[in-house]
Structure formats: C-alpha cells, structure tokens
Amino acid sequence: MTLWVLGLNHQTAPVELRERAAFAGEALPRALGSLRDTPQIAEAVLLSTCNRTELYAVADSAQALDQWLHTQAGDLQGYLYQHADAEAVRHLFRVATGLDSMVLGEPQILGQVKDAWSTARDHGLLGQRLDRLFQQTFSVAKRARTDTQVGANPVSVASAAVRLAQNAFARLDDSTVLLVGAGETIELAARHLSEGKVRRLLIANRTLAHAQELASRHGGVALPLTELDRHLGEADVVFSATAAREPVIHREMVAKALRTRRHKPMLLFDLAVPRDIEADVATLNDAFLYTVDDLERAVEDNRRGRREAAAEAEAIIDLQVSRFVETQQASAHQAPLRQLRAFGEATRTELLERARQQLANGKPADEVLELLAHGLTNRLLHPPTAALRAAALSGDADLTRAAERLFPATPGYRHPPVRPDDADPAP
C-alpha cells in the first residue's frame, strides 16, 4: 500500500470551497467513522483547520481518498493536490513546520497536526506507518524551529488580525473588543490583545464556562452567545472564530448594532472556516469586514522577513525526508530477513531437542549427529528447493538468478548421490 496525502488549502481553494470541506465539531467524528468503514483505506489522519483540509492515508490508490472526500464535500476537482510516498512525507514535514501556512512559520499548526494525529489514534485509524511518520514529523518540526529563525516572532492569522486592528484604531486601549468563540484562535487573539491593552474585552461563547475561563486569564467579561445580539453594538472591533456550521453574526445584527452606535465604524474579523459572519455584512456602511483570505495580503510583509530562515528549514526537511524514507525502506527489507531467521531458529530448536532426546534414549552420538545434520539440511533447503522447482515450471528466471546469487557454486564440491528420502524432503 502507498502513503498518500490529498487536500486543499488557502493557496488552491477559496474560503467558500474550504468551508465545504471543513470538519469541525460533530462533523469530525462522523468523518473519522466513515474513514474507518472504508475498506480501501488502511490508516488515516484527517487534518482540518481554517486554511486547509488534508487526508493522510495508507491506501491502495489515491482514488479511494478522492472518492471518500467527494462523498463528504462534493466535487472539488481542480482545487485538490495529492502527493505520494516521499513527497507526501515532505509535504507533512513542511506543513507541521509552518512552511506551507498562510503566515509563514506560524506556530499553532504543529499543535493542530498533533491534535489530528491524537484524534485519529483515539478513533482507531492510526497504524504503524502513519504513527511513525507523525512521530518523526513532530521531531523534524521541533528541530527546524529550534535550529532556524523560522519560528522567531511568531505571527498567526489571529495576531495579524490584531495588528490590522491596531493600525486601524490609533488607540485600542480606548476601544471595546468583542471575541466570539473560545478556541485556540480566539485564545491567541486574546493573548495579543492583552499585550497591547484594550479598554474593555468582551468574550461570547456558546459554552459560558469556556468564555469565563478565557475572560479570567485576560481580564475580560464573559457572555453567553445568546446575548451576542444585545452586546454587539458595544464593540469597536469584533474577532469571531467558532466551530459553528452556519454564521453566528448576521447582516441584520450588524445593521442594528451600527444604528445603536450611531454609525460609529466597526471592524469585524471573521477568522473561522466555515465563516462566522455573513459575507453581505461587508455591504453595510461603517462595517469593515475581513476574512481569513483578506489576511493573506495583510501578512505578506511577515513572509518576506522569514524567507531566509525558511530556506534553512527546507534544507533540514530535505535531509530528514531522505533519512525517513531510507529508514522505512530498510525496515521493509528487514521483514523477510527476520522471517528467514525465525524459520532457521525454530528449525534448529526443534531438531536440537529431538537430538537430545535421542541421546538420552541411548542412541549413539555419531548416528544422532548424522541425523541432526541431515535433518537440518533437508528442513532448511526444502522451501527454496520447492520454490525453485515451481519457478522452473513457470519460467520464473528472476527467482533462478536470485538463487544463483544466494547459493554460489562451491569450487571443487561434488554433489553426493541423491538418496530416495532426499528427493522430496519433508518440511
């Protein structure tokens, strides 16, 4: 079976297609259950973030992955990429290191990759090949970030949004900021906002306890999501990143909030995929909406500063891909060697025990040694002898040549006459 990755990301597909293929909340365990029930896929890890959905799998063909994704998300042809074996390994190493992210070198993608691996393991989708690959991925990503500056001054989508808000409002410390959600992206936004100070921080979430935990860490006020409509007008800046399948902020909600604010400008950042804020909010006067795709342009300056470090990280990845592939190939080649040695050891143990019993029963030692040597020869040579006979009948010249390399002719050796019991030695 082959190692594959099939996916789409912010470079290949717009947000409306990425949200179709996003697996968040209850959709993720359902998708993993479906993968587990797909016989053509032996192992799988599903990575789904705001900017990418990728299926890493051990399968007979990429068609099995493509059919599964088509069933889950519809026709995505023209927006997908796929890699096999060494290139799949390289792709995962680059993703986990942050070299394939919207914000070059962003740190949280490694945590998301670890979560995807852990979730796959919990759902019984992880086998030896993918487990080894992901364990090595974590090691490579750590080394690349430690040995280069690719992770220096990390900039995420959330921090890029905060920076844009800081540029739009000369003083965020005189502004009210509303965070919708309580996941990792909102946590990052809250952390960056706390560093820069804001006058008032509101945090709304479906699970109030999660909002309260976040509020306690960053000096905010927690709200249930049901009160979002009532408090939206208080916010100068809104950051939203929930796992909802449908928008949580609608055009009419923002229009009402703007009337409450007497059309004082409001900045809204939709950091979620699927989107949290209805797209036509952007048509409202005094409402300025940014999506994750808009942030692609906002973070270009950060990429330029990290390209030199990224080149160093790429060199590390190139070396580690080669080493990983060589290790896997060597491991695959070791399997028949281990099998051969196990067969030899089992044969030796069995016949040696038989010889000891014969000695204990008083049989002469010379006769026992002769029987032992004869038995070992017959038992060890029976499988290759039978295989070579079958090869001769089928015309398998490759096996014959392999036998000639494995058992070269011994100069001066004369074959003994074939005894009747040597003709077809028993296994």
UniProtKB/Swiss-Prot annotation:
Amino acids binding NADP(+): G181, A182, G183, E184, T185, I186
GO BP terms: protoporphyrinogen IX biosynthetic process from glutamate
Keyword Nuclease: no
Native organism: Stenotrophomonas maltophilia (strain R551-3)
Record note on domains: Possesses an unusual extended V-shaped dimeric structure with each monomer consisting of three distinct domains arranged along a curved 'spinal' alpha-helix. The N-terminal catalytic domain specifically recognizes the glutamate moiety of the substrate. The second domain is the NADPH-binding domain, and the third C-terminal domain is responsible for dimerization.
InterPro entries linked: 4pyrrol_synth_GluRdtase, 4pyrrol_synth_GluRdtase_dimer, 4pyrrol_synth_GluRdtase_N, GluRdtase_CS, GluRdtase_dimer_dom_sf, GluRdtase_N_sf, NAD(P)-bd_dom_sf, Shikm_DH/Glu-tRNA_Rdtase
Binding site for substrate: T49, C50, N51, R52, S101, E106, P107, Q108, Q112
Matches recorded under PANTHER family: GLUTAMYL-TRNA REDUCTASE (PTHR43013:SF1)
UniProt-listed Pfam families: GlutR_dimer, GlutR_N, Shikimate_DH
Signal peptide residues on this chain, from the entry's feature table: none
Official protein name in the record: Glutamyl-tRNA reductase
Residues forming the catalytic site: C50
Gene designation per UniProt: hemA
